[in-house]
UniProtKB/Swiss-Prot annotation:
Coiled coil found in the keyword field: no
Function: Methylates caffeoyl-CoA to feruloyl-CoA and 5-hydroxyferuloyl-CoA to sinapoyl-CoA. Plays a role in the synthesis of feruloylated polysaccharides. Involved in the reinforcement of the plant cell wall. Also involved in the responding to wounding or pathogen challenge by the increased formation of cell wall-bound ferulic acid polymers. Methylates almost exclusively caffeoyl-CoA.
Organism, scientific name: Nicotiana tabacum
Residues that hold substrate according to the record: 21, 163, 194
UniProt keyword list: Lignin biosynthesis, Magnesium, Metal-binding, Methyltransferase, S-adenosyl-L-methionine, Transferase
Protein name: Caffeoyl-CoA O-methyltransferase 6
Length: 247
């Protein structure tokens, strides 16, 4: 029995590792995915940034390694060139994007905390992709409002990734749907929100999970009803919903 208890304790420890946002019920299966498919193919700069971010006190905010790999593949499949990222943190998903884009690709990156971005910036610079990034410190909504005032910005983005304040996801969608091109893709992160989207309202959950839960539910409902997009919700990381603009 002691051996089984130790195994269970070890499994719990693995489930809490940095960047582990998988909704898989089996930690062993998630580790298999990481060790078989993700880590062996993870570019060295991304590995370096992942390990650097692991030392940060807010490391659970980072994009998981399997989601980073997924984003990289997606960007290459849609041949993205002009992209946007709302919510950067230390830049793991930003680096995945920058590495996936062609040399003349561009990323407009926005975050309210430049200090976190600067933690990962030396790694991004060493990877030789910093020239693709236009980082703006501050809230994204005012920047988006200015952008949509200029019709020349409409329909110019191939891909937009949102991993920021969940209470503004609806507000972001209202704006960026005008900026992404028809046939382009928007990715919303955390749309399964720690699995809380199917939990009873009185279920025990962390305060931040409970606070943002209704905003995530509101977003999911709105995306499902939006006739301008096709959607696909995937259980990658903490849930990511892809929206392909069709009109």
């Amino acid at each position: 029995m002691a051996e089984n208890g130790a195994a269970q304790e070890n499994q719990v420890t693995k489930h809490q590792e940095v960047g582990h946002k998988s909704l898989l019920q089996s930690d062993a299966l998630y580790q298999y995915i990481l060790e078989t498919s993700v880590y062996p193919r993870e570019p060295e700069p991304m590995k370096e940034l992942r390990e650097l971010t692991a030392k940060h006190p807010w490391n659970l905010m980072t994009t998981s390694a399997d989601e980073g790999q997924f984003l990289s593949m997606l960007l290459k499949l849609i041949i993205a060139k002009n992209t946007m990222e709302i919510g950067v943190y230390t830049g793991y998903s930003l680096l995945a994007t920058a590495l996936a884009l062609p040399d003349d690709g561009k990323i407009l990156a926005m975050d309210i905390n430049k200090e976190n971005y600067e933690l990962g910036l030396p790694v991004i610079q060493k990877a030789g992709v910093a020239h693709k990034i236009d980082f703006r410190e501050g809230p994204a909504l005012p920047v988006l409002d200015l952008m949509i005032e200029d019709k020349n910005n409409h329909g110019t983005y191939d891909f937009i990734f949102v991993d920021a304040d969940k209470d503004n996801y609806i507000n972001y969608h209202k704006r960026i749907i005008e900026l992404v091109k028809v046939g382009g893709v928007i990715g919303y992160d955390n749309t399964l929100w720690n699995g809380s989207v199917v939990a009873p309202p009185d279920a025990p959950m962390r305060k931040y999970v409970r606070y943002y839960r209704d905003f995530v539910l509101e977003l999911n409902k709105a995306l499902a009803a939006d006739p301008r997009i096709e959607i696909c919700m995937l259980p990658v990381g903490d849930g990511i919903t892809l929206c392909r603009r069709i009109s």
